[in-house]
Amino acid sequence: MKPLASLRDIKTRINATKKTSQITKAMEMVLTSKLNRAEKREIVRPYMEKIQEVVANVALAARASHPMLVSRPVKKTGYLVITSDRGLAGAYNSNVLRLVYQTIQKRHASPDEYAIIVIGRVGLSFFRKRNMPVILDITRLPDQPSFADIKEIARKTVGLFADGTFDELYMYYNHYVSAIQQEVTERKLLPLTDLAENKQRTVYEFEPSQEEILDVLLPQYAESLIYGALLDAKASEHAARMTAMKNATDNANELIRTLTLSYNRARQAAITQEITEIVAGANALQ
């Protein structure tokens, strides 16, 4: 009876693994479709770069006198961290959270020296478990977020810098390179000192004044950078989860092959044992 029981156990494992493989394969196909849609949204990047060029020219013409363009003594640092709402995405969340956590531990001696703004339930849970100061959060964003979905937290984030809640803001997210490569990225978002590094210069005539234009343009520009990073992170999330599901499917298929081989060997051994017992019984009767 033992070989039969062993065969049943192996067969049960094979069936269970096949069901798991079917689920992960279906998820992989869905995520491939989501990634394709997310990649199409990446085409906004050249437009954002052009906007940056225009904003830089306006800022340089105004001699960088706007508060959002000027560095000030840093009493408190803000960290905007983009994670996902769900797991099953390989190292997508752990890589970015590890970098943020290590950076904060290195830079700050007290929680009073920094504040965290987090997108995604995984990041929110991570920081709350460690009693780290989260001042803003947003979760349950759609897989293909629009600017309207992120506008409120982006507006509040820029507002917190403007009112002096923190004196600089860093943004952490996964930059999408390709379906198989995503890079954890740290970017200094505020103040917008990188605009001064833009060497391209075009002469404009302004109506109204440069200062009035910057009052409207710079907050909107900073908000658009947050949205651009979110789109980047979403594409990375779909790619990481798609890769994780593909690996899970491949591992399940390999396990099925191994179990099938074990099943066939066990079945052959059981048949051989039965034949041996029959022959032995026949010999005993002679």
Swiss-Prot record:
It holds the Pfam family ATP-synt. It comes from the Bacteria. Keywords: ATP synthesis, Cell membrane, CF(1), Hydrogen ion transport, Ion transport, Membrane, Transport. GO terms for cellular component: plasma membrane; proton-transporting ATP synthase complex. InterPro entries: ATP_synth_F1_ATPase_gsu (IPR035968), ATP_synth_F1_gsu (IPR000131), ATP_synth_F1_gsu_CS (IPR023632). Its main location: membrane. GO terms for biological process: proton motive force-driven plasma membrane ATP synthesis. It is a peripheral membrane protein. One of its GO terms (molecular function) is ATP binding. It is found in: Cell membrane. F-type ATPases have 2 components, CF(1) - the catalytic core - and CF(0) - the membrane proton channel. CF(1) has five subunits: alpha(3), beta(3), gamma(1), delta(1), epsilon(1). CF(0) has three main subunits: a, b and c. Produces ATP from ADP in the presence of a proton gradient across the membrane. The gamma chain is believed to be important in regulating ATPase activity and the flow of protons through the CF(0) complex. NCBIfam families: ATPsyn_F1gamma. Belongs to the ATPase gamma chain family. HAMAP family: ATP_synth_gamma_bact. This is ATP synthase gamma chain. The gene is atpG.
